[in-house]
């Protein structure tokens, strides 16, 4: 699928990728996250080994795309020299415009929490925690952090859900 191609390119970035043509919108990362969330709700009611295995195969494509510090935003990192035009020159620089970095985080976390609740697996949850930890380190009011406000409430809602899932208050504080 197009989404799996994006994550495969992210796992192997290149300055030859024309991200704007390959990925029309900077929020395309959310499509597999929301699909996994929906499939996880199905698994809660109708356990299905084949569906669970399929979700795991999608997560196997997503996981290698995550950067070492937890950041996962393919609109920027497929081609770090020439990211998607909505992404800006550096992380978080266009968050209040069109980048959707925190929007993507929100949908990832919601999908990951639903997957964990349905399966007990931390596979997706650990990916989401790593990205949320990156956000906690890099976004906020403190010196050296990007002081930005997301354009959608999904990031804050998801961080609250991550707090409920993990008990870690730093996610609740970041949501505030």
Spans of features found by a protein language model:
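Short, small-residue-biased leader/transition segments that mark boundaries at the very start
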Residues: 2-7
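Extended ligand-binding groove/face enriched in aromatic
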Residues: 10-27, 43-153, 157-176
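Glycine-rich, aromatic-lined ligand/substrate-binding cores of catalytic
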Residues: 32
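Aromatic-residue-lined binding/catalytic grooves and analogous aromatic/hydrophobic interfacial grooves
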Residues: 35
């Amino acid at each position: 699928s197009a989404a799996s191609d994006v994550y495969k390119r992210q796992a192997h970035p290149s300055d030859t990728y024309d991200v704007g043509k390959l990925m029309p919108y900077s929020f395309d990362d959310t499509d597999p996250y929301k699909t996994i969330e929906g499939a996880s709700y199905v698994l809660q009611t109708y356990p299905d080994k084949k569906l669970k295995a399929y979700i795991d195969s999608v997560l196997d494509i997503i996981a290698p795309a995550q950067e070492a510090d937890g950041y996962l935003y393919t609109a920027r990192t497929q081609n770090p020299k020439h990211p998607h035009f909505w992404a800006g020159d550096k992380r978080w620089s266009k968050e209040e415009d069109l980048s959707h970095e925190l929007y993507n985080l929100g949908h990832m976390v919601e999908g990951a929490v639903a997957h964990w609740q349905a399966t007990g697996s931390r596979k997706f949850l650990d990916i989401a925690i790593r990205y949320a930890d990156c956000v906690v380190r890099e976004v906020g009011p403190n010196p050296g952090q990007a002081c930005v406000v997301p354009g959608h409430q999904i990031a804050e809602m998801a961080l609250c859900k991550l707090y409920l899932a993990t008990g870690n208050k730093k996610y609740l504080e970041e949501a505030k």
